[in-house]
């Protein structure tokens, strides 16, 4: 937790040299998680109770800084499938969308409540519903359910729910049209 977590913290610069993103999931928050001798520091990603979690709860201005694409790649390859926070750097938010990761927003108070529930009851299962723009969970003690409203720009929500976030897949699915357009463009004809 904390405000203004930049992409250099999410994925240290030395891991940008990897030729592919395949191993990127080993390194999110690496310098926050490990000492220079390789021993573990106290960090939520190192805690057994959070292993396998796929929703990341963050505070304000998450993903600021250089906005490197490697940051959401590292989180996705760690297993994060959605991020819920107060606010994001716009480029980071867009990079998340391009990988199919919803980066949704909610109030500071709601984030605080969600983090508190997670901290005291790490077994709590959260459900993110982009159609209803909610995140819900049940209280483990009594089975009571709580629903929290989220915000996501409508074009992002539609892209994620309709599967149009993946521009590469869309290009391949429309390859005939791509080729027709390429033939009309003299500057790329023959490539």
Question: Which positions does each model-derived feature cover?
Answer:
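Fe-S-dependent hydro-lyases/dehydratases of central metabolism
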Residues: 1-191
């Amino acid at each position: 937790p904390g405000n203004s977590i930049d992409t250099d913290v999410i994925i240290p610069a030395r891991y940008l040299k990897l030729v592919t993103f395949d191993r990127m999931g080993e390194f999110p928050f690496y310098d926050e998680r490990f000492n220079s001798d390789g021993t573990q520091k106290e960090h939520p990603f190192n805690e057994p109770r959070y292993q396998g979690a796929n929703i990341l709860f963050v505070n304000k201005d998450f993903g600021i800084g250089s906005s490197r694409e490697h940051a959401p790649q590292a989180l996705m390859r760690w297993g994060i499938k959605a991020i819920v926070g107060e606010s994001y750097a716009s480029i980071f938010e867009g990079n998340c969308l391009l990988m199919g990761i919803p980066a949704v927003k909610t109030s500071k108070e709601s984030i605080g409540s969600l983090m508190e529930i997670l901290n005291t009851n790490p077994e709590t299962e959260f459900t993110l519903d982009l159609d209803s723009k909610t995140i819900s969970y049940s209280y483990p003690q009594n089975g009571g359910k709580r629903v929290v409203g989220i915000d996501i720009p409508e074009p992002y929500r539609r892209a994620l729910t309709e599967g149009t976030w993946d521009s590469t897949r869309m290009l391949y699915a429309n390859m005939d049209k791509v080729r027709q357009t390429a033939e009309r463009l003299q500057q790329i004809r023959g490539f």
